[in-house]
Amino acid sequence: MKASLALFSLLTVFTSYSLKSPAVPPTVAQIQANSNFAIADGARQQIGSTLFYDPAYVQLTYPGGDVPQERGVCSDVVIRALRSQKVDLQKLVHEDMAKNFAAYPQKWQLKRPDSNIDHRRVPNLETWFTRHDKTRPTSKNPSDYQAGDIVSWRLDNGLAHIGVVSDGFARDGTPLVIHNIGAGAQEEDVLFSWRMVGHYRYFAK
């Protein structure tokens, strides 16, 4: 009988502590991981709202400029996903190019930065991510990629492409990618479909 009462008292104390004790605050690493996950969610929010691929040059407001939500190119998926975390690549890329123009690819016969288009060009994004220590190793191991990572490729025709790793998985465990390669923002099993040239993680774990 005494043993039963002692056990009951112990369970009561444990239950009381479990219900009333404050939650352990998240660590900085956990907060950063959640932010990376939110980048993936920011990309996911574009599925069904970004419906067209449209590479037209557009005059944008600065900072915070964007083309109409229903259209865009592959880089716009990344730009909008990061904006969901209050990261403005238009501003960041423009400011870095203004100070270090020669460090960026000279592919477009420009003499100075152009805040309307520079951040929408994949090679410029690759350069910015690399210059700001966002790079991760490229590999064929699916477990090396987490939701919110940004990956760039060279397509079979040589064109640059970029997308956001989602929190979804293919049947074989490969992370899916949210990207726009012609039909608006889509979530597809394309992580290892082309030659990967860049792997980036904005919020380091």
Question: What is the predicted function of each stretch?
Answer:
Residues L10-Q30:
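Bacterial Sec-dependent signal peptides at the C-terminal "C-region" and cleavage site
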Residues P25-Q32, L60-Q69, K111-S115, R136-K140, ...:
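Second-shell loop/turn segments in exported
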Residues F37-A40, A98-I178:
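...with weaker cross-activation on analogous glycine-rich loops/strands in unrelated enzymes
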Residues R44, G48, I79-V87, H94, ...:
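Sec-exported extracytoplasmic/periplasmic mature domains
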Residues D54-S75, D88-R112:
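Acidic helix-start/capping segments at beta-turn-to-alpha-helix junctions
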Residues D172-K205:
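Low-complexity, Gly/Ser/Thr/Pro-rich intrinsically disordered linker/tail segments
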